Amino acid sequence: MAYLLGTDEAGYGPNFGPLLISATLWETPDDVGGEELFGHLGHVIASTLHDAGSRIVMADSKAIYSPDRGLKHLERGLWASLGQLGHRPKTWRDVWAAVAPEALAAMPNMPWYVDYDAPAPSACNVAELDPLAESLQAGLAAAGVRLLAVRSRVVFAEEFNRLVEQNGSKGLMLSRETLALAASLINGLPSGKIASVCDKHGGRNRYGQLLSEQFSDWLVEVYDEGSQRSVYRFGPPERRIEFCFRARAESCLPVALASMASKYLRELAMQAFNRFWLARVPHLQPTAGYPQDARRFRADIAETQKRLRIDDGILWRMK
């Protein structure tokens, strides 16, 4: 057997709300790579909404989510996937506990998360999700594939600002946190080939030094470095590890599901954030947190923020 891991992020650019980095880990037959996994599971998983039919869609979150389209397809894919791991979330907090439990410990420091909860899923009928999980389970079993993990790293504003300062740039921080998350899943695996596919981090083409920092026991070999993809390999013959950083990596199923997990948790975080401020500032319009609108929102809440003595450090991401 071999292992496929994919990572992707959501919330890299906003000033409000957390950065989400997610990874998914799969066990596959030796001859199935990241590019082939969609085809291998095509009877139960679709890569686009266009021809999905009754199948579960797993794709770049930007292709299946928009404010108008809603959370339905994110929830269908995530609930079916989490069902393979023994999770059946019924509330907002259940979702965090299943995918990013460490985030729950940080939430009491931010008033918009204190005591917040809501039913989940919010865009799907629960009755339709159990059959999806069962269908996915049967499809994975027939293909000799197992989903082993869906894990997210949540970087809230205060930690985000600190890590950017420590690393010297937002891009370097993203790369290091992504590789740390990937390593946390890889290090527990038994012998077997491990292929990791990561969406490229902005304009970065060179990741060798960062991989050497994270996997310091091994000599990292550079196989390709360019604008479209960068490939590295290391480790002993019985546990060879490959990292491929590439543009449009969501065409690989493990990355697509990671993209969906990151986007969904980001939307859940902003749901609580907006609910808090809208309850306290009359006529306030919600925000997605991106720079231009974030400045409008920040000005609109300034008086209430001051009255509530909420420090900018837990609210505003500097970059």
What are these regions (language model features)?
Residues 1-319:
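RNase H-like, Mg2+-dependent phosphodiesterase core
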